[in-house]
Protein backbone atom coordinates (compact mmCIF):
# COMPACT_ATOMS: atom_id res chain seq x y z
CA UNK A 1 0.00 0.00 0.00
CA UNK A 2 1.23 3.51 -0.74
CA UNK A 3 1.96 6.06 1.96
CA UNK A 4 -1.18 7.74 3.34
CA UNK A 5 -0.77 11.39 4.33
CA UNK A 6 -2.79 11.03 7.53
CA UNK A 7 -0.16 8.59 8.77
CA UNK A 8 2.76 11.03 8.63
CA UNK A 9 3.14 11.14 12.42
CA UNK A 10 3.20 7.34 12.61
CA UNK A 11 5.77 7.09 9.82
CA UNK A 12 8.02 9.59 11.54
CA UNK A 13 7.42 8.30 15.06
CA UNK A 14 8.43 4.74 14.24
CA UNK A 15 11.26 5.69 11.87
CA UNK A 16 9.58 3.85 8.99
CA UNK A 17 10.77 4.12 5.41
CA UNK A 18 7.81 5.23 3.29
CA UNK A 19 7.39 4.47 -0.38
CA UNK A 20 6.70 7.86 -1.96
CA UNK A 21 4.57 7.98 -5.09
CA UNK A 22 3.77 11.70 -5.47
CA UNK A 23 5.15 15.13 -4.59
CA UNK A 24 2.38 15.88 -2.07
CA UNK A 25 3.57 12.96 0.05
CA UNK A 26 7.05 14.45 0.24
CA UNK A 27 5.59 17.78 1.37
CA UNK A 28 3.50 16.15 4.10
CA UNK A 29 6.52 14.27 5.46
CA UNK A 30 8.80 17.31 5.64
CA UNK A 31 10.83 17.17 8.84
CA UNK A 32 9.49 13.73 9.79
CA UNK A 33 11.70 11.37 7.77
CA UNK A 34 15.32 11.17 6.66
CA UNK A 35 14.97 8.31 4.19
CA UNK A 36 12.45 7.04 1.62
CA UNK A 37 11.92 4.84 -1.43
CA UNK A 38 10.56 6.29 -4.66
CA UNK A 39 7.80 4.47 -6.57
CA UNK A 40 7.96 4.55 -10.37
CA UNK A 41 4.90 3.83 -12.51
CA UNK A 42 6.17 1.54 -15.26
CA UNK A 43 2.79 0.88 -16.85
CA UNK A 44 0.26 -0.34 -14.29
CA UNK A 45 -1.13 3.19 -13.85
CA UNK A 46 -1.78 2.70 -10.15
CA UNK A 47 0.79 4.55 -8.05
CA UNK A 48 4.11 6.16 -8.91
CA UNK A 49 5.97 8.87 -10.80
CA UNK A 50 5.67 8.35 -14.56
CA UNK A 51 7.69 11.13 -16.19
CA UNK A 52 11.25 12.52 -15.94
CA UNK A 53 9.79 15.91 -14.94
CA UNK A 54 7.90 14.45 -11.98
CA UNK A 55 10.96 12.50 -10.84
CA UNK A 56 13.22 15.56 -11.12
CA UNK A 57 10.75 17.57 -9.02
CA UNK A 58 10.67 14.83 -6.38
CA UNK A 59 14.46 14.61 -6.21
CA UNK A 60 14.75 18.39 -5.85
CA UNK A 61 12.34 18.35 -2.90
CA UNK A 62 14.09 15.41 -1.25
CA UNK A 63 17.42 17.21 -1.48
CA UNK A 64 15.87 20.42 -0.15
CA UNK A 65 14.40 18.56 2.84
CA UNK A 66 17.60 16.55 3.38
CA UNK A 67 15.86 13.21 2.77
CA UNK A 68 17.93 10.37 1.35
CA UNK A 69 16.42 8.32 -1.46
CA UNK A 70 17.24 4.77 -0.37
CA UNK A 71 15.75 2.88 -3.33
CA UNK A 72 13.53 3.11 -6.39
CA UNK A 73 10.88 0.54 -7.16
CA UNK A 74 8.07 -0.41 -9.48
CA UNK A 75 5.55 -3.23 -9.68
CA UNK A 76 5.31 -5.78 -12.48
CA UNK A 77 1.65 -6.20 -13.32
CA UNK A 78 2.03 -9.02 -15.87
CA UNK A 79 4.77 -11.53 -16.57
CA UNK A 80 4.10 -11.10 -20.29
CA UNK A 81 4.92 -7.37 -20.05
CA UNK A 82 7.97 -7.44 -17.78
CA UNK A 83 10.50 -6.55 -20.50
CA UNK A 84 8.35 -3.66 -21.71
CA UNK A 85 7.95 -2.37 -18.16
CA UNK A 86 11.65 -2.77 -17.47
CA UNK A 87 12.48 -0.67 -20.51
CA UNK A 88 10.28 2.19 -19.29
CA UNK A 89 11.53 1.82 -15.71
CA UNK A 90 15.20 1.90 -16.76
CA UNK A 91 14.64 5.00 -18.89
CA UNK A 92 12.95 6.83 -16.01
CA UNK A 93 15.60 5.97 -13.42
CA UNK A 94 18.60 6.52 -15.73
CA UNK A 95 19.58 9.82 -13.99
CA UNK A 96 19.48 8.20 -10.54
CA UNK A 97 22.75 6.80 -9.23
CA UNK A 98 23.70 4.75 -6.18
CA UNK A 99 20.22 3.66 -5.13
CA UNK A 100 18.88 0.16 -4.63
CA UNK A 101 16.24 -1.31 -6.93
CA UNK A 102 13.32 -3.58 -6.05
CA UNK A 103 10.65 -4.50 -8.57
CA UNK A 104 9.74 -8.15 -8.27
CA UNK A 105 6.94 -9.85 -6.44
CA UNK A 106 6.63 -13.63 -6.76
CA UNK A 107 6.09 -13.60 -10.55
CA UNK A 108 9.20 -11.50 -11.16
CA UNK A 109 11.32 -13.60 -8.81
CA UNK A 110 10.29 -16.81 -10.57
CA UNK A 111 11.27 -15.14 -13.85
CA UNK A 112 14.75 -14.38 -12.51
CA UNK A 113 14.33 -10.61 -12.11
CA UNK A 114 15.92 -10.20 -8.68
CA UNK A 115 17.72 -6.80 -8.61
CA UNK A 116 18.88 -5.70 -5.13
CA UNK A 117 15.77 -6.62 -3.14
CA UNK A 118 12.54 -8.56 -3.74
CA UNK A 119 8.99 -8.32 -2.40
CA UNK A 120 7.58 -11.84 -2.49
CA UNK A 121 3.99 -12.39 -1.42
CA UNK A 122 2.38 -15.79 -1.91
CA UNK A 123 5.79 -17.43 -2.41
CA UNK A 124 6.58 -16.66 1.24
CA UNK A 125 3.54 -18.77 2.16
CA UNK A 126 4.60 -21.71 0.01
CA UNK A 127 2.31 -21.02 -2.94
CA UNK A 128 3.44 -20.76 -6.53
CA UNK A 129 5.16 -23.00 -9.03
CA UNK A 130 8.34 -23.63 -7.03
CA UNK A 131 8.65 -26.77 -4.94
CA UNK A 132 8.58 -24.97 -1.59
CA UNK A 133 7.04 -26.03 1.71
CA UNK A 134 3.63 -24.44 2.42
CA UNK A 135 3.62 -22.30 5.56
CA UNK A 136 -0.10 -21.53 5.82
CA UNK A 137 -3.13 -23.75 6.36
CA UNK A 138 -6.69 -22.98 7.48
CA UNK A 139 -8.54 -25.63 9.48
CA UNK A 140 -11.76 -25.97 11.43
CA UNK A 141 -13.71 -28.70 13.22
CA UNK A 142 -16.87 -30.75 12.78
CA UNK A 143 -19.72 -29.48 14.98
CA UNK A 144 -22.36 -32.09 14.15
CA UNK A 145 -23.08 -35.05 11.87
CA UNK A 146 -26.40 -36.01 10.27
CA UNK A 147 -27.42 -39.04 8.24
CA UNK A 148 -30.04 -37.87 5.75
CA UNK A 149 -32.50 -40.02 3.83
CA UNK A 150 -33.60 -39.72 0.23
CA UNK A 151 -35.87 -36.69 -0.01
CA UNK A 152 -34.41 -34.90 3.01
CA UNK A 153 -33.22 -31.32 2.61
CA UNK A 154 -30.70 -29.16 4.46
CA UNK A 155 -29.60 -25.54 4.52
CA UNK A 156 -31.53 -22.33 4.00
CA UNK A 157 -34.45 -22.72 1.59
CA UNK A 158 -33.71 -26.45 1.51
CA UNK A 159 -31.00 -25.82 -1.06
CA UNK A 160 -29.35 -29.18 -0.31
CA UNK A 161 -31.64 -31.94 -1.62
CA UNK A 162 -30.77 -35.58 -1.05
CA UNK A 163 -31.31 -37.87 -4.03
CA UNK A 164 -29.33 -40.57 -2.22
CA UNK A 165 -28.68 -41.41 1.44
CA UNK A 166 -26.19 -38.72 2.46
CA UNK A 167 -24.00 -38.20 5.50
CA UNK A 168 -23.31 -34.53 6.14
CA UNK A 169 -20.97 -32.77 8.54
CA UNK A 170 -21.67 -29.32 9.91
CA UNK A 171 -18.36 -27.44 10.09
CA UNK A 172 -17.54 -24.37 12.17
CA UNK A 173 -16.96 -21.16 10.19
CA UNK A 174 -19.16 -19.04 7.96
CA UNK A 175 -19.74 -15.66 6.35
CA UNK A 176 -18.72 -13.85 9.52
CA UNK A 177 -15.28 -15.43 9.33
CA UNK A 178 -14.80 -14.90 5.59
CA UNK A 179 -15.20 -18.61 4.89
CA UNK A 180 -17.31 -17.92 1.80
CA UNK A 181 -14.23 -16.39 0.13
CA UNK A 182 -11.91 -19.20 1.24
CA UNK A 183 -13.84 -22.33 0.36
CA UNK A 184 -13.20 -24.11 -2.89
CA UNK A 185 -15.04 -27.13 -4.18
CA UNK A 186 -13.55 -29.45 -1.57
CA UNK A 187 -12.26 -29.66 2.00
CA UNK A 188 -10.18 -32.48 3.47
CA UNK A 189 -11.49 -34.68 6.29
CA UNK A 190 -9.41 -37.65 7.49
CA UNK A 191 -7.18 -37.26 4.42
CA UNK A 192 -10.12 -37.57 2.02
CA UNK A 193 -11.42 -34.85 -0.31
CA UNK A 194 -15.00 -34.05 0.64
CA UNK A 195 -17.45 -32.01 -1.39
CA UNK A 196 -18.56 -28.66 0.06
CA UNK A 197 -22.35 -28.45 -0.14
CA UNK A 198 -24.04 -25.25 -1.39
CA UNK A 199 -25.18 -23.62 1.83
CA UNK A 200 -22.88 -21.35 3.84
CA UNK A 201 -24.38 -19.86 7.00
CA UNK A 202 -23.20 -17.04 9.24
CA UNK A 203 -21.14 -19.36 11.45
CA UNK A 204 -21.05 -22.78 9.76
CA UNK A 205 -21.23 -24.70 6.49
CA UNK A 206 -22.10 -28.17 5.18
CA UNK A 207 -19.81 -30.92 3.86
CA UNK A 208 -20.68 -34.28 2.31
CA UNK A 209 -18.82 -36.96 4.31
CA UNK A 210 -20.72 -39.96 2.98
CA UNK A 211 -18.72 -43.17 3.47
CA UNK A 212 -16.22 -41.63 5.90
CA UNK A 213 -15.99 -42.48 9.60
CA UNK A 214 -16.18 -38.92 10.90
CA UNK A 215 -16.72 -37.88 14.50
CA UNK A 216 -17.70 -34.58 16.10
CA UNK A 217 -14.54 -32.56 16.71
CA UNK A 218 -12.75 -33.99 13.67
CA UNK A 219 -10.30 -31.59 12.01
CA UNK A 220 -11.36 -30.16 8.64
CA UNK A 221 -8.75 -28.73 6.29
CA UNK A 222 -10.39 -25.75 4.60
CA UNK A 223 -7.52 -24.09 2.74
CA UNK A 224 -4.04 -25.37 1.92
CA UNK A 225 -1.60 -25.77 -0.93
CA UNK A 226 -2.99 -29.17 -1.89
CA UNK A 227 -6.58 -27.89 -1.90
CA UNK A 228 -5.59 -24.88 -4.00
CA UNK A 229 -3.86 -27.23 -6.43
CA UNK A 230 -6.90 -29.53 -6.64
CA UNK A 231 -9.22 -26.58 -7.29
CA UNK A 232 -6.66 -25.23 -9.81
CA UNK A 233 -6.34 -21.94 -7.93
CA UNK A 234 -3.22 -20.36 -9.44
CA UNK A 235 -3.19 -17.08 -7.48
CA UNK A 236 -4.89 -17.69 -4.11
CA UNK A 237 -4.58 -14.14 -2.76
CA UNK A 238 -8.29 -13.86 -1.99
CA UNK A 239 -8.30 -17.05 0.06
CA UNK A 240 -5.05 -16.23 1.87
CA UNK A 241 -6.30 -12.84 3.06
CA UNK A 242 -10.01 -13.46 3.61
CA UNK A 243 -10.15 -14.93 7.11
CA UNK A 244 -11.31 -12.32 9.63
CA UNK A 245 -10.33 -11.51 13.19
CA UNK A 246 -12.41 -14.07 15.10
CA UNK A 247 -10.39 -16.97 13.70
CA UNK A 248 -7.53 -18.02 15.96
CA UNK A 249 -4.04 -17.61 14.53
CA UNK A 250 -1.42 -20.15 15.60
CA UNK A 251 2.21 -19.48 14.71
CA UNK A 252 4.81 -22.26 14.64
CA UNK A 253 8.47 -21.27 14.82
CA UNK A 254 11.20 -23.55 13.53
Role assignments for model-derived ranges:
Residues 1-2, 16-21, 100-104, 118-120, ...:
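Short, hydrophobic beta-strand segments that form beta-sheet elements in well-ordered domains
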Residues 1-30, 80, 109:
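N-terminal active-site wall of soluble small-molecule enzyme domains
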Residues 4, 45, 50, 123, ...:
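Gly/Ser/Thr-rich beta-alpha loop segments that engage phosphate groups in nucleotides
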Residues 17-18, 101, 115-117, 135, ...:
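A residue-level structural signature of the nucleotidyltransferase/glycosyltransferase Rossmann-like core
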Residues 20-23, 52, 83-86, 132, ...:
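Electropositive phosphate-/nucleotide-binding environments in soluble metabolic enzymes
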Residues 27, 32-35, 40-150, 211:
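Active-site loop/helix belt of alpha/beta enzymes
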Residues 147-254:
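C-terminal accessory subdomain/extension
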Amino acid sequence: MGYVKNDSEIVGGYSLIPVIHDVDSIESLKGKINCCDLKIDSGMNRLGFNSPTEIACAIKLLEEYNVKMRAVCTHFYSKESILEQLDKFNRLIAPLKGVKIHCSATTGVLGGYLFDEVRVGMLAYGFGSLDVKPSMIITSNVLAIHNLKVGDVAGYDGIIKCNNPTKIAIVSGGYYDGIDKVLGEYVIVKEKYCKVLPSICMDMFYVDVTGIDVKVGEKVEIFSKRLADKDNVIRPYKQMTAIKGRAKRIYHYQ
